[in-house]
Amino acid sequence: MRHVRAMERIEAKKAENRWSLRQPKKARGPGVPKSHWDYMLEEMEWMRTDFAEERRWKVVEAREFAYQVVEWHLASPEEKKALMVGGRGWGECRNVPIPGHAGKRKEVTVEVEAEDEDVEMLVGQEGELDGEGEANKVLESIDEMRVNEKERENRPEDPRETVNINQDIGEEVDAEGEADADGEPENGEADAEGEADADGGPVGDDVVGLSEIDAAQDDTRETSERPSYRRDTVLPNGLVIHKRFANAYEIAIARGPVLDTPLANATVDLDTLTKSSSAATPATVPAEPSVSPDEPASFDQLFPDLAMYSGPAPPENDKKYRRDEGGTYSHRMAHTSRIMDIRPILVSTLQPAKNLIDGEWDLHDGPYYEEVKGAADIPPNVVAAFNTPFGGKASRPLEHMRVPEVPKPAAHHLRAQLLWSPEEDKCLLKLVAMYPFNWDLIADSFNTEMILIPVEKRNPYECWERWYYTFGEGKNKPRQDAPPSAPPPAPASATQPGTATATPVPQSAVTTPGVPPSANLPSASGRPQQTGGNSVSSLPTPTGEALPDGAPPPPGMSKRDRMAAKPKYEGTKRSVRHQAIYDAVKRMNRRREAARAKSHKDNAQRKVINVHESHSMSFPHVAASTPWELVEAKYQRDVQIAQQRQQRAMQEQQRQLAIRQQQAMMSAQQQAQMRPPNMPNVPNMPNAQPIRMGPNGQPMPTMAPSQQQLLNAVAAATAANRQNANGAVQGNPNVRPMPVVQGQSPQVQQQMLLQAQQMAAQQARVLQAQAQAQAQQGRAPSMGGNLQPPQLGVSSPFAQSRTPDLPAEGAGPSGINPTPSPAMQAAAIGAQSSPQIATMGRAPSNNVPPHLRVPNAGTSSPQISSPMALPQGIPNGAGMPVQGAQTQGIQIPAAMMNNATVQQLLATLAASGQQMTPEQLRGLMLRSAHMQAQAQSQVGNPGTPQMGVQNIQGVQHFARSPSLQNAQSQPRSSPKPGPANGQGT
């Protein structure tokens, strides 16, 4: 199936003129020694073939035997006798006479020739004989003939038998005792016995007779006039006909019976082909005597166009390492084209520069020389009728060949017509005789021999046209492109006017006098004729009609050749020139654009240099960094590395401190559980908190300040310090603090808590005395009324927000504001450290009397918590007295802050990603201690239960009656000191 598909593709390419008919010469490669495996494979192939043929032969034999057995069983007894060996029936052997038995035998006296004729007649009429008598007669005559032959062989030679044999051959013999006629020589025939010669002399043993003389004359005549015997004939297509056959017609007749043999026959008897070959038309030149007409022809003689498949050829001359490439066992079996039937030779292998002299090839000494014996004398119809069995279809006669497509050379109207010289015509005729109708090879050889200029090369169609209309069947016929009234084409030797030598006139140049050349062009193809322009007559156009009595045209051109031969410009000279200039300009523009793009691309590629990454620049348009920038970058990198190292060390310390803090907290919890629940704190103890009494005189539980307010204040102060360090504008009230971020690790909180406790322990005692002194100073009267010491006004959730620079809006007519708790005062001091703290948690407030503003110490929302106002005696931005003492070098002990408050403060700062310095923490603790001291000084004389505890500072109170509210809202001075002002005596 693969072979069939491959052959179909080859035929399709042939139809499209895409299959090359010129096969290159097979190159001889180096010798490949055969291995043991190669021999095994070859023997395997032959064994496979033998087994297949043997099986086929056995099947055929079994079939023939079966037919004969059935025929014998269906035959009559007489027919069975004829079918059996010896011609005797079943059991007839008993009737055969025994040799030596005295039986009655009938003598048959007939001559040898007559006996042969009788036997032939009887053998041919065996089926028509009736009765056993006739059959017995035939058998007896055959037996007698055999006996006579044996006796003749045993006895000496008899002259009479010699005469009878000569009679069988057909020679004339004189009668016994009869003289020769006219005494003429008998050409070797023997005279009668006892007859004298013509000259009357006796004939002896030592006398040379006339027969010897005549024989010598015959030998001399044969030597002098020896006829020329027929040799092998080479056909135009390269096939070599054996000398047995005179022409291809005899081969076709001789192998006809072989091709007509039915497929059921497994073998072919070549002996039966002898009579058929001898019955062919006798040739004028006899074959050599060595070729006997009775000898059957071999298959290679009957089929010279086929490759014989033989077995592996053994190496000759002990050349074991060279494979015989000429052997038939490795021949190609696929018949792709007729070129495989011949041995094509490329013109380049003939070396025309050395072997072509004056138009004659000197190739008589080369290995590729083959004498052309009558190749040009064979009629073309014989060559065309001869076809190989692999062709698949009978070749069509030449009359049915269609006119090929006319090639269109480039710029055909601008090209002058080619003229054929007598030398070129002679070379064309020689090539046509050498390569009959192979126009591709003819054109190639012609261009190699004659043409030296590439412009004047001939294509196959031009060669065919020149031969057909000058020397072929179309010599005396009008051309297809000539008008009916045009004269016949001029011969090749026609002389043009104005030239001294005979120059052939091109067929297309013959025109009608007085008519322009363009007017003589017929529109056979249906295209409009050109009315003007520099154009010449074109070649014949394919019409699809049969070319009568024409030679085979050249093969069609390939698609590439047709595209190359297509004219690029058409029209007048001016239009052609304009088109050419326009195309040249476009080509120039395209070249410029391509060159520009290529140069730009090359320049872009040159900028990219494969160097080390330390030498490359990520941003080509950015200037290189200065030394200062490089040093700064290195410093920042070192700072980051140091911070990372410090952070890792702090994490390790936090882990250790967390363990210690956890143990301390557990011990503190155990002590708190062991203390009685109603046991009050001792007021004289340094760490004891002031006791707050309720309305009924019972001590109230100590209320811790709002931890969230303290945390917000510390976070806002830290954010403000950071913004000031980064170059922010100081005192901008619109800057809001950063939000507090939750989620800091507990290790950081524990570390900050321990640091706060250590610093608070150093300032435990000093703030107690400082608070008492400030309490005494705050009771001094001022401006004709009882003035309170500097206090921090804390507004209720309804109080209007304000900045620390403004006075408190909640103050009464006398400027006295309600005093908050110490925890609230500490929060107000923390808010004073930064102007941004005052903007936190501003809630709208109507003008509510101060006695109705209830401080909320338990909320943690920044909107509900109230901002703390600065004392009136301290300017904005100024430090507290404690801070002034510190600046003067006085060591002030601070009161211990609540552990939970400090821990919450540090946790809030750590959650916001801020690191609090010891100075900030120390200042915060001092402010908290100062507020606690102020709270304790205000609780010096809480008053009596009858007067109420509404003036107790730092305690949550609620209005219970309108009279009490009025008393609180408008305090008035009295000449008598009393508990109305909230001061005890």
From Swiss-Prot:
Residues 169-198 have a biased composition (Acidic residues). The keyword DNA repair applies. Residues 24-100 form the HSA domain. The keyword DNA damage applies. Residues 412-471 form the Myb-like domain. It comes from the Eukaryota. GO terms for cellular component: NuA4 histone acetyltransferase complex; nucleus. One of its GO terms (biological process) is chromatin organization. It is found in: Nucleus. Pfam families: HSA, Myb_DNA-bind_6. Residues 520-541, 793-803, 932-954, 962-973 have a biased composition (Polar residues). Residues 591-664 form a coiled coil. Component of the NuA4 histone acetyltransferase complex which is involved in transcriptional activation of selected genes principally by acetylation of nucleosomal histone H4 and H2A. The NuA4 complex is also involved in DNA repair. Component of the NuA4 histone acetyltransferase complex. This is Chromatin modification-related protein EAF1.
